[in-house]
Structure formats: structure tokens, C-alpha cells
Amino acid sequence: MISKDHLHHLDPLGTTKSYHMNTSTVSPPSPASSISLSQSAWLEVRLFYVRIAPCVVENVPDFLTLRHPRRETGASLEVNGVRVPSSQTASLKLRRDRVDRESSEVTYVSTETVRVTGCVDFEVYDNEDMVLCGNLDRIEGAWNNGTVSDPKTGWGMDCYIAMGNGHVSGPSASVFFQPKFGVSSPSVEVYIAGCCGGVPVILTKTIQASPRRKVARHVTLDAIPEDEEVGKEQDIGTIGDELARQSKVQMMESEVDEYDDSDMKMAQRYYPEGMYVDEDGQLSWFNAGVRVGVGIGLGMCLGVGIGVGLLMRSYQATTSNLRRRFL
């Protein structure tokens, strides 16, 4: 046992302070409170439901695949009580539950128990074609930007229509997005039911697939030469050629309606005068007639001019002869 004098000898200025904790006043957390705190952070999903309408019910698959891709640090995932490492992808089956031929809709359901914490993404596939994607996350009410959330627990869901093979762009080969079957913009409803800390949680969202929009078309016309100096007959021929020439219009479009696969098309347009152009590009009989008519007109003008000149010359000669006689 150390005496007070010995302590004073070790610290004569009395700078050493001793702290005493009354352990009788601090009680350890009860097991029930620790369990409730840990369970309140988990969202337990007991039902995952997807409804798609309209669709071609004769071609819909028997199963869809629900995937939870790799997650970031801090996000946990359990499937039927088994922890899934964050570096691995979990896959579940969505079985076809109901098909309504009158309303052309189909429903897929999964009743596997899935528990998540943090932000966990999910993806729904038809074979290798993504149908939709989204995420589950616990968010604050102030940051709710279009996300469906539960006001009591704070858990929210956001989802989007996926139009391509594992991507959110490009045409999809899924049977749910096939314009040739008359289905290009179906409505997809996602429904999740579960609980968080003993509080029931229901999240549902309906998303509508819309046809892709066209972008502005860039039109380029061929330049018309203006600085060439030619003769009168060549000018007349050039005018006729310019009236009959065709204009190539290049349409640059990155997206087309009904998920068309082509991104660039070349089309040829004609001026109204182009109807007088044959398939081989030569002048038609109409333009040839115009040329002949212009030539005839010029010939007539030249003939009249020559005739008037000869008449004037003969008149002058006659006048001079008469003057000589009278003089």
C-alpha cells in the first residue's frame, strides 16, 4: 500500500490528479436495447414484386433474375440469414406469379428474406437483358429527390427503366421492349414489403418507359457555282442543269423512335424541278424542249434583225437613187 507521504514525495507540487469513476452509477446497456439498436439499422425485405403492363403475355419468360451487385464498404447484405460478402453478387429468382391476358400484364414475385444496411443496388434481368435497376438506401427527408421513402424508418427506394444490355442506354432485346410486337413503352411497377426495427415498411414506385426522342437534324446542301464565266448558250444550259440537279441531304440522327437500331441515315431529296430528271441523271424531253425553244427564239430574233437590217439598207439605197434623179 502506497502512503500519502510517498505520493507527496513523488509529486511535491501536487500536480498529479487522481480520477475515480463510480461504476455503481453507470450500468451496461441491456441486451434488449443493443439488439433493438442493431436491428433498427436493417431493412428486412420479405416480398419483392414486379408488375409489367402491357406486354405480349405469350412470349414472357417464366423467371426473371434479381441481382444485387457488389457493394461499397459499409453496406451489408444477407439472403435467408447468410451474409453475402461485399465483393460478390447475389442472384435471386423472380418467379412468374400471375398472367392477365385481358389487361396484358404479368407479375413476378420473390419471397426470399433479404436484409440490407446502407445503400444496396438491385437489378432485374430478362436473361442477360436488364429490365430495370434501382437502389435501397436510408435517406434524410431533406434530401428526398423523387425517391419513394417510408417516413417512419427513413428507408427509400429509387428505380429506373433500363433500355440496354446491362446499361441504361441503347436498345434492349428483352421481350418487354419490342416494337415489332406492338410493345415499346410498358409501365413497370416495383413493390417492396418488409420491416425495419419491427416497423412495417412498404415501398412502391411505378415507372413508365417512353420512346426515345429524335434529335435535331443537320441538313447540308451542295454549293452552287457562281463564278464561272461561260457563253450565252452555256449560261442557258447551266440554268437548266441547276433547275434539274438533285440535292443530297444528309440526316445525322443519334436516336430514333421505337428503338430503331440505326444511328445514321443517308437520304436523297429533290427540288420540285427534280421531277423532270430521269433516273440516269440526263435531261428529260421537257428540258430538251426548253433548250430547243430558246434556240428557236434566238434564231427568230436573229432572223428578224437581219431582215430589218436588209430592209433599212434597201430603203436607204432607194432614197439615195430618188434624190439623184430629182437633183
Curated annotation (Swiss-Prot):
Keywords: Membrane, Transmembrane, Transmembrane helix. One of its GO terms (cellular component) is membrane. Its main location: membrane. The chain crosses the membrane at residues 183-203, 292-312. Residues 12-31 are annotated as: Disordered. The keyword Membrane applies. It is a multi-pass membrane protein. It is found in: Membrane. It comes from the Eukaryota. This is Uncharacterized protein At1g01500. The lineage of its organism: Eukaryota, Viridiplantae, Streptophyta, Embryophyta, Tracheophyta.
